[in-house]
Amino acid sequence: MTDRPHTPLLDTVDVPADLRKLKPEDLRQFADELRAEMISAVGTTGGHLGSGLGVVELTTAIHYVFDTPRDKLVWDVGHQCYPHKIITGRRDRIRTLRQGGGLSGFTKRSESEYDPFGAAHSSTSISAALGFAIANKLKDEPGRAIAVIGDGSMSAGMAYEAMNNAKQAGNRLIVILNDNDMSIAPPVGGLSAYLAKLVSSRPFLELREIARRFARKLPEPLHKAAKKTDEYARGMAMGGTLFEELGFYYVGPIDGHNLDHLIPILENVRDSDHGPVLIHAVTKKGKGYAPAEAAADKYHGVQKFDVITGEQAKAPPGPPAYQNVFGETLAKLAETDKRIVAITAAMPSGTGVDKFAKVHPDRSFDVGIAEQHAVTFAAGLAAQGMRPFAAIYSTFLQRAYDQVVHDVAIQNLPVRFAIDRAGLVGADGSTHAGSFDITYLATLPNMVVMAAADEAELVHMTYTAAEHDAGPIAFRYPRGNGTGVALPAVPQKLEIGKGRVVREGKTVAILSLGTRLAEALKAADTLEARGLSTSVIDLRFAKPLDEELIRRTLAAHEVCVTVEEGSIGGLGAHVLTLASDEGLIDAGLKLRTLRLPDMFQDQDKPELQYDAAGLNAPQIVDTVLKALRHNSAGVEEAGVRA
């Protein structure tokens, strides 16, 4: 454990009201202490470091100038919210970040009044802030709404949809564009800072508004000419023509690490009668911590690390990660199939598409944070005879559900969905859990839905998807490493809608989908030890179901239990529907379904999350015993928790 940093000024600040008592000349030291505290905390817990380091000064300035929590501060995504949490009454718990029972790694309404809106998916902040601004306006209540959004999040259409509707909020809405990738503006200097102060000042804004009103009274040709002249003049100097076209007063670019620039500009905007305003702040991800600044990913997401050296704790060697198995398998298949194309929405390394891109760069597409586009782009490719793989996290595929339905399923186009992070995901908690994809995909006509039980099955399913041209097909797999089984040298094409019997028994049957198979086998061992002959079925497909295998299994066993890493409405519901429709439970069969509970589970270690969800071997055993009307108290006597 690292020593805590010396933070005399930070120690005096528990909430932003305390920060506002500091003198302006003390803010530089305060920001340095805040940065040191954040580095120390994340070194202990792991988490998203680089983003937070890049907004230390911006966070300080916003809370210093604005009256939070009356003024609503909405962070986009939330990766950068750690400094915000430290100075909003949560410093005493900051070393519980992303731990079970600890602070969320994102903003969370139930956690603090300083988190007015929860976030973890991108590009939502402007819409939410606009809602706060308009609500205050309608209720005639004081308060501004400030949205802080990164340049990466601006690649999603939702941000522009919000900006296109923001004009009616007037000066109650302020958008701060945190440009930490230098993708929009060049490096800023003294001239940019001077211009930003000038255009954010009340006299300049009032002069511009007078000029606008005067120009509107001119004949139409002159009015348009005056408008264009104003836009071109500011566009050449400031680079904000796009935002002005959307109805914003553009201020910037400014140095997002220079408090002497940030404070007066934020004060000018706060005191202005004109708006909405967009402030363009250029920051550096990983700022102030040399190992982060030197790293290619700027320490975006890190394990626990040594604060002095920056060296991250390394996990012990083990089986390959699922996303790497997928990426490498797809790259190998693409060597002989030129129709295979890979698409990712800003997550190349997270999905394994980076492995594919290294070998086939011309057939790899990172579309940015634009899942809707990714899916329909894949649909267009499929319609023209390509074999597109849209590799998207389960939680992010939700953002493109209409495209899945309308552009893919209805047209029966063979888009392949590689669904990463299926099931519970650990430290990222409920916002990133892949809980719903079985339910929302298996309900669609034409869709095939598979779930890999281990990394070997993932190889087979990737190949099966590549060869499936009859319509859309999806295969899901979890975050983390595989189970350690040997990878097949030659992938097999699985028969669509066919499961496999892993273990034969006579009394109990466990029908598993996905990586709960390992727990199902453990449960079978325990049940066998109690004299209950147990079958284990790896169904492989949530849709179409292996109806023949299910009928045979239900008819031959006293108790059948389905197990899946998904919400209600998934595999269990489909098996129950089949059993009910065909009268398979009329003869007294005891059929039970185990799935994720009807709640959003907070962050914890995945194995503890699944234990809480009731999807580990002991809970499977207990479900069987209760169904057989055994005394469940006897479970503990057998060394199994009831």
From Swiss-Prot:
In the UniProt record, does the keyword Transferase occur?
yes
- Under which pathway is this protein filed? Metabolic intermediate biosynthesis; 1-deoxy-D-xylulose 5-phosphate biosynthesis; 1-deoxy-D-xylulose 5-phosphate from D-glyceraldehyde 3-phosphate and pyruvate: step 1/1
Q: Which PROSITE patterns match?
A: TRANSKETOLASE_1
Enzyme class, one word?
transferase
Q: Which UniProt keywords apply?
A: Isoprene biosynthesis, Magnesium, Metal-binding, Thiamine biosynthesis, Thiamine pyrophosphate, Transferase
The record lists the catalysed reaction(s) as: D-glyceraldehyde 3-phosphate + pyruvate + H(+) = 1-deoxy-D-xylulose 5-phosphate + CO2
Quaternary structure and interacting proteins, as annotated: Homodimer.
NCBIfam families the UniProt entry points to:
dxs, PRK05444.2-2
Q: What is this protein called?
A: 1-deoxy-D-xylulose-5-phosphate synthase
User: Which species is the source of this protein?
Assistant: Sphingopyxis alaskensis (strain DSM 13593 / LMG 18877 / RB2256)
